[in-house]
Amino acid sequence: MRTIAEVLRWRARRHPSLQAVWFEGKSQSFAELNESSSQIAAALVDKLGLEPGDRVAIIDKNSAAYLELFFALDKAGLVAAPINWRLTPHEAKLIVDDVKPKLIVTGSEFKAHGVAAGGPTLTFADLPRGGDDPMRDVDGAVTWQFCTSGTTGLPKGAMLTGWNVLNTGLCLAMQMPEIREGGRALCCMPLFHIGGGGWVIWAMQAGSTAVIVREIVPDVLLKTIVEQRIETALLVPAMMLFLTELPASRTADFSAFKHIAYGTAPISPALLRRSIETFKCRFSQLYGLTETTGPFAALGHEHHVGERLLSCGRPMFGGRARVVDSGDRELPPREVGEVVYRGENLMAGYWEREQETADAIRGGWFHTGDAGYMDEEGFIFLKDRIKDVIVTGGENVYPAEVEAVLMGHPEVLECAVIGVPDSRWGETVKAVVVPRAGTGLSEASLIEWSRDKLAGFKRPRSVDFVEALPRNASGKLLKRTLREPYWAGYARRVN
């Protein structure tokens, strides 16, 4: 099997009555999901006239319909381009302008985002249906285009093939054999992320039921875990914190849990210990990026001891990682450089960004932008971020984008945006601002000013005012110097 559509067809033949997905009290078998997604795929081709390779943007919270559309688009030979529903209409339009979709599909509450973006828009309820599986999925074709970005803050589409997705799923199944046929996997990460969209496919690839949660509400999440007898889950540390802090967690029945994977944000040893005590199951840390189709390295439960707790693990089956210097020369163990990776889950490239693809993938090795080292046994230890991306609660925030907004304030002379440690979110956004002379700019007024210009997770949670920003002799801003006081005492400064 080389496409996600093939996975669904095969599962529908092998176990047609096995529950494929559960969402808000309703379920579909693999056979039912296969049939319904085929009807949408046929209509997209026959009634809407979409051609192989056309992009279809999706804006909504998690749902069974979202998953159904993933399969339908692949069957029709189309590319799914999920967009973060938390973005403002203005921000969503920037992504749509880059993706150039032939169709935008939204939930009913986000139709205005699609309309504002200027593209042809249908809600899930309005999608046409009817016809047989067009079977236009092709090995090697792009299946998903997830939005990612560099330190410029400009959107880039990471193009992932069906085999990229399935290869990660096979590697993950070896790391977590508890993801099994007939099992129940919690799917609570946003489907517009590789961690959400990927996890739901990887669970179904193994034959598990995807138990989808629309959005993260701690009480609802806890109730779902207990009532649905969840066996496996992918969580971010913020979710683990929410769950372990709920009073009901002290008496909840978590006995069905077999294995929890966590990642996408820094985690404290104290929270990890508390989570292990609460859920009483195996834990694996995952490390990867959108460009690597999610995780390429894992720290298994048996390695959650001693110094290894600071590691993000070793490359999973079939992948290779190394640490290189600025000249791409491999470094010896324990010498810090840039972590690079190669494997079959490496993206096809950035959408319409040939030069940026060439810059990121050199000699077959993807440059992660993360600084770290490897020990003598191949465990990766991350130290800092070469790229300036801030990871807050599993969401990527690009400082240049936030800085551009804040610089639009008439009382801001200069600003720099950095990530600072936070026990709940891993990191939060901090703005360091040089105000114009004679103004009365305050922290509260600047944050409020950004409210309708930035999504909530991008807005600064705090603002420091300074007389000048630190720069070197050539005038380059020294963000490391800005970050240092806030990160003092932290051994690890990156997800």
Predicted region positions:
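Conserved pre-ATP/AMP-binding loop-to-beta segment of ANL
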Residues: P16-S17, G130-C147, L154, N164, ...
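AMP-binding/adenylate-forming catalytic core of the ANL superfamily
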Residues: L87, I104, I225, A233, ...
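Conserved AMP-binding A3 loop
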Residues: S29-A31, T143-L170
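Gly/Ser/Thr-rich phosphate-binding loop
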Residues: Q205, I230-L235, E245-E307, R320, ...
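Conserved AMP-binding/adenylation subdomain of ANL enzymes
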Residues: L166-R184, F192-T232, E245-L246
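AMP-dependent adenylate-forming
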Residues: E6-S29, I58
